[in-house]
Each structure stands twice: as structure tokens, then as C-alpha cells.
Amino acid sequence: MNNQDIYINLLNILSKEDIKVDEPMKKHISFRVGGPADILVRPRTEEQLKNVLKLVKEESIPYLIIGNGSNILIKDGGIRGVVIELADNFNSYEINDTRMTAQSGALLSVLGKALQKQELKGFEFASGIPGTLGGALAMNAGAYGGEMKDIVKSVRLMDMEGNIFELSNEQMEFGYRKSIISKNGYIALSAELELQEGNYDEIKSLMDDLATRRITKQPLNFASAGSTFKRPTGYFAGKLIEETGLRGLTLRGAQVSEKHCGFVVNQGEASAKDILDLIYVIKSAVYAKFGVMLEEEVKILGED
């Protein structure tokens, strides 16, 4: 099935404005790089999502599911097939007592503010993470001593057959930057979070403190995908990179952040290749000096 046929079939599922052809992926990921997606779709209901999945499966069309693109790098050749975006088109939430139920496309920052307003604590660590709930669940996102596994009660998921089911916290198999979602290719639809009653001023104070620490220590004024590398056992990636003498190293439009060596940033005009080449230089130099092979935390996708 060619792209024109795929588009025609998608029009039976989605409205025209929710289907984009040859869509530049740099508009959809935080690194602000990446070639075009053949087709990008934005389903607004679980039924639409189910029908899109049915189409790509039956026709063997390659597909990729993204949130707000804060932890991925799309190569300059772009993405073949269909990109399914679950972001502000899939972001409702509600709060009952000490529990929040939210769709996977909801931004963590938005959820954090809503919980603060309701004087519910436990989510502060995640409130400044630049991503969606779905992405945070998939990788068990964490910061400042907290992880998603600490607050998740249950998650509603969809498999590639369109089956919808619910898993408990234990069944989610949360680990360091992983979960059953990343393991089995499930799609997070929504999650129920368990919080605790707190004090508005104390919650706000902690959130403000964490925000200040991020602003002070992280290069938020440049496009990036957050921490570029996972933490190697017994080490800190940023410290290894700094001690290798790479702080500020620039390769065309990509740079090892001056503020935090664990971040590779786009100075404005970088290509995906610039970033990937710099990542290779970093990994090679750190391995040569310390014998430690860094592993990317950012997901690298697409074609050269």
C-alpha cells in the first residue's frame, strides 16, 4: 500500500486536519531535528487509535508512537510509514480524593500544577520533567529521588490487536528507565496515580525548589532530549564526560552542554547527524579513558 492509499484509508478513521503528509519531525521532537514522517496522525479517541492500529497491522505498515517527543532523536532521513502522536489530542485528566486518572498525552507539568492546586503531594519530582505521562510510564521516568513506580496504582494499555486491559503497579514491571510498555510494545492509554494529602505552600515550595535546580543545572535554553545517556553502574555519565575533557565540545551545530556535560544540545542549526556524530565522539572518548561504554537514554529512530 503506497502513501496515497494509506492516506485515503486514514480519512475513513480520522478527520483531515488530524492527518499530516510529509510532516517535518523537527516540529514534533524537543531536539528540533529530524526528517519528515511519511504520514503523521493524531487520534483523539481510543476507538480512532484502535482503528489506526488495525490498519497499520493489516497492511504491514511501519509505525511509531510518540508523545511530545522529549526523549527521542529522529534521523535526517525521517520516518517511513505512520507516526501516531498522542499528545495534546489525548490529554484529559480528573482528580478524585487522593487519586488522579490521566490520559497518556497529558504533560507532566500540567498534571503537577493540577495536583498542587488540589494540595496533593508525591508528584513533585515529575512536575518539571519535559514529557507526557505516557512517555514517563514507558521509561519509568524519575528525578530527584522519585520515580513513576512510586505513584502509579494502575495503567490502562492497548496492544497491537486493539485489546484494552489494565495492569497493576507490580504487573507493570517497572525498572530503571524501563517498564512492560517498552518491553512488549504496549501503548499507554491512561493511568491512575495514588497521591497523598499535603499542604499547598509546602508542595509549591518543593516544586519551585526543583524548578530552580533544573534551571541552574540544566541547559534549558537549548533544544535537547534531556539526559543523553543512562547512568552507568557506579558512575555518573555527566561526570565521566566532564573528566574526559569534553565540556563545551562542539561539532557543527551540536554541543556538549557547558552547563551540564550529560546533555548534548542543539545550538540552533544542528542536524540529527551532527548530534549522532557528537554522541559517537563522546562514547569513544569516555570508553578510551575509563573503559566505560555509555548507553544512550535518548531513543534514536528513523533513517539516515
Swiss-Prot record:
Residues 32-198 form the FAD-binding PCMH-type domain. SUPFAM superfamilies: FAD-binding/transporter-associated domain-like (SSF56176), Uridine diphospho-N-Acetylenolpyruvylglucosamine reductase, MurB, C-terminal domain (SSF56194). Keywords: Cell cycle, Cell division, Cell shape, Cell wall biogenesis/degradation, Cytoplasm, FAD, Flavoprotein, NADP, Oxidoreductase, Peptidoglycan synthesis. GO terms for molecular function: FAD binding; UDP-N-acetylmuramate dehydrogenase activity. Gene3D superfamilies: 3.30.465.10, UDP-N-acetylenolpyruvoylglucosamine reductase, C-terminal domain, Uridine Diphospho-n-acetylenolpyruvylglucosamine Reductase, domain 2. This is UDP-N-acetylenolpyruvoylglucosamine reductase. It comes from Clostridioides difficile (strain 630) (Peptoclostridium difficile). Belongs to the MurB family. It catalyses: UDP-N-acetyl-alpha-D-muramate + NADP(+) = UDP-N-acetyl-3-O-(1-carboxyvinyl)-alpha-D-glucosamine + NADPH + H(+).
